[in-house]
Every structure is written in C-alpha cells, then in structure tokens.
C-alpha cells in the first residue's frame, strides 16, 4: 500500500509531462485503475491523514451520485477533522450538495432527504458553514428549492424569491461566481423565457458579479457577454453592444490562442445578430 500511495502522489506530475495525447490518456486510465484498487484495498481507518486526503481530492470524482467510499469518509469525519482540519468537511459538503442539485433540477423530491442530513448524520460536515440569521439547513433549503423551482417548475419568480433569501444570508461571503451563476442559470434552465422582472433581476446579479475585483478573466468575459444578452432581451441595444465590445476587449488578454479565437468569434456573432435587430 505504501508503494501504491507513493505512485499516486507522483502520478499527476508524470502524466503531465506526457507529450502525446494518446500516451497521456493511457496513463490517466492506468492511474484511475490504481486509485480504485487503492481505496478498495486500504481500510478507511488508515486513510485518515493528509497524504491520503490529497490523493482522494486529486482522483476521486464527485458526480452527484451516492458514493459508498465517501459515505465511509462521512462516518469518520470527526477523525479527519482532528488530523486533517476542515478541508474534508468542505469536500464532503460539496458531495452532498451536488446530489441535492442533481435531484432538485430533475424534479425529484428526494433532494429533501439530503437536506435532512445537514442537521442529521452530516451535522459535523455542515458545521463549517457560517451561520448568521439562519441554520445551514435553511440556507441550503433556499438554494435547492430555488433550483427545483427554476429547472423543473420553470418558475422564475419563485426562483428569484428563494435566491434573494439565500443571498441575504450569504451577505459579504457571496462571491462574484455566486451572483453570475445565479443569473446564468435562468438562461440555462428557461432560455430566458421568464417574466421581465426576472430578467431585470438577472441583470442586477450580473452587474454585482462584475463589481468584484477578484473575478477571473474567463468569468468576466462570460458575465459581460451575458449582460449583453440580458440588455438585448430588454431591448437596450446600445448597452448590449457596449457589453459585447467590452467582452471582446477583455478577451484580448487571453493567452490560449485557440480559446481566444473561439470566444471572439462567438462575440462577433452576437454583435452581428444585434446589428440585424437595430
């Protein structure tokens, strides 16, 4: 097991230096198989340490499905917290949240069962969530009720009500990506076919997201283009054009030429479509 642990620790660096895509993919598959063998063979009690947690975070996939191995981690979270700190709790919180998101978006009320875990067997996990005016369970109830309403019920107004309550609780802890993704989900789930009041709220959220100084370049470009789309829906065509042009200018800073070219082509298409309307 010690040898396998060392191999997994060094694997990312080794895979990264493979020049041929086919060789890289072969090694990725081999390493994934080694990881599965490792967690199958090694008792969970022996994995409560920083090195193994680093390996888990590197190779374990959280895909919104129940996972027997991660359930074992939940059972041993108190030991993880003592030996590793709060990082495992944050990791397991992400695991449960992704399950709730998948179920809520699909309209499966089973997501409420996972909400119950927040102050049940996963209470220690969610103890890392700051509590201001409401419990962790209430906070995430607002969030996943919002996703249920938007993606399954197509209820944009209900979504806004729940998300506003969620953001009020987040307060200063809210990040640019929180506001930006909340706005983007409206278009992802409904194609923008919601009342104008909801579109106006997505504009408010996107403007807030763009006010953050620590926003990544890719997010900034994405949110500017989305703000352009929102202004277009609101028939504020001059404002839409300004947003698209600013998104294009920001894209000039990108280093990956292929990605830059694709993004700029998409922005040019948006500008051309806008000119046909004006």
Where are these regions (language model features)?
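Oxidative protein folding and maturation machinery
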Residues: 3-278
């Amino acid at each position: 097991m010690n040898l396998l642990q060392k191999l997994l620790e060094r694997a990312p660096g080794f895979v990264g230096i493979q020049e041929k895509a086919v060789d890289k993919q072969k090694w990725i598959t081999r390493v994934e198989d080694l990881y599965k063998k490792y967690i199958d063979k090694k008792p969970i009690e022996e994995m409560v340490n920083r090195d193994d947690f680093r390996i888990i975070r590197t190779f374990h996939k959280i895909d919104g499905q129940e996972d027997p191995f991660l359930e074992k981690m939940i059972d041993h979270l108190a030991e993880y917290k003592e030996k590793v700190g709060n990082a495992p709790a944050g990791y397991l919180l992400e695991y449960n949240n992704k399950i709730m998101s998948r179920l809520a978006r699909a309209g499966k009320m089973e997501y409420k069962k996972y909400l119950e875990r927040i102050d049940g067997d996963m209470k220690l996990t969610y103890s890392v969530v700051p509590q201001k005016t409401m419990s962790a369970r209430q906070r995430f109830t607002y969030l996943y009720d919002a996703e249920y309403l938007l993606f399954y019920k197509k209820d944009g107004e209900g979504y806004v009500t729940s998300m506003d309550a969620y953001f009020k609780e987040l307060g200063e802890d809210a990040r640019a990506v929180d506001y930006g993704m909340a706005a983007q989900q409206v278009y992802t789930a409904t194609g923008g076919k919601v009342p104008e009041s909801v579109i106006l709220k997505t504009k408010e959220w996107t403007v807030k997201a763009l006010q953050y100084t620590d926003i990544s370049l890719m997010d900034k470009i994405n949110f500017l283009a989305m703000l352009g789309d929102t202004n277009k829906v609101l028939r504020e065509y001059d404002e839409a054009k300004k947003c698209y042009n600013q998104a294009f200018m920001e894209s000039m800073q990108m280093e990956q030429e292929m990605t830059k070219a694709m993004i700029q082509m998409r922005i040019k298409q948006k500008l051309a479509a806008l000119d046909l309307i004006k």
